[in-house]
């Protein structure tokens, strides 16, 4: 497959690989990351947002059935939902991820029993957390060092 940015059909261009014609596409999903011809990762972030919500619903039902400390709930979130939210962020982490950050902030606002209008700074400060953007930056730096070394 070949990425093609323009809508114009190129009739005379035909690319072959092992005597097979390669298709022109606007987006392609590789290992769960949607690669787009225009370079944005909105579809990736949207699908990760939806998948993380699917992982969050069973977690919330466990919280309703069993009384857990906040630290245990955070540990469960970090082990079950956070990997989904940050999947492939070494590649797409340069872009803003508003939907992904919203899952994180909504979880902690619900966990701390504060209103949705509460400042995110206060919400992150109470449990000693950072926005997911910081975690994505750390993952990108670690990945870069891994590639270099």
Identify the role of each PLM range.
Residues 1-6, 28-149:
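Non-catalytic, peripheral interaction segments enriched in hydrophobic/basic residues
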Residues 1-26:
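Short, conserved micro-motifs composed of acidic
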